[in-house]
A protein has these predicted regions:
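FIC/Doc superfamily catalytic core
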Residues: 1-185
Length: 185
């Protein structure tokens, strides 16, 4: 597995083909540029709402996709839903916008920026832990994944950011970098 073995990269033919397909699709998208501003806005909105919905759903948020859209784009409150669920949707959307600003301005993702994103996601929900490493062990119900012990987190985050920089320097395919980041975080 790429992220945990660091220097060992397993590149199967199937993976090479999938990465080539990604490159082909990206080239087709680039060829369509510049996309009309209205089309870009619609794509951006649809992505942000669906990503917010799916991320929060995994964490137990009960807002539907349509309710998530109303909360983040229209500022509507949904009867019978908790303030926490509303804040989770709003904060996630804010975090997406924050990350997009990083990409536009070519700002390096660091431990500090990851903590800032974490603080945005937990804003108004969990002040004590927002933007900080956790200090207690946790379990994820229904998952076989065992999160690291609190005393290991800082070291693992340092390793994560170091490895991410190495992968960028080595010109590792962006899809593999994204997979590493998703799997590791």
């Amino acid at each position: 597995h790429y992220g945990r073995t660091h220097k060992r990269e397993i590149m199967t033919e199937e993976l090479k083909e999938l990465l080539q397909e990604c490159d082909t699709l990206k080239a087709r998208l680039v060829a369509l540029r510049p996309l009309p501003a209205e089309a870009l806005k619609k794509i951006d909105e649809a992505f942000a709402v669906e990503y917010t919905y799916e991320s929060n759903r995994i964490e137990g948020n009960t807002l539907t996709l349509q309710e998530t859209e109303l909360v983040v784009n229209e500022g509507v409150t949904i009867a019978g839903k908790s303030m926490r669920e509303h804040l989770e949707a709003i904060n996630h959307r804010e975090a997406i916008d924050y990350i997009k600003d990083f990409a536009k301005n070519d700002i390096e993702i660091s431990e500090g920026t990851i903590k800032e994103i974490h603080a945005l996601v937990l804003h108004g929900i969990n002040r004590e832990n927002a933007g900080r490493y956790r200090t207690v062990p946790v379990m994820i119900s229904g998952s076989q994944h065992i999160p690291p012990q609190p005393y290991l987190i800082e070291e693992q985050m340092e390793d994560f950011t170091r490895r991410y920089k190495e992968m960028e320097k080595e010109k590792v395919h962006p899809v593999l970098i994204a997979a590493y980041r998703h799997d590791t975080l």
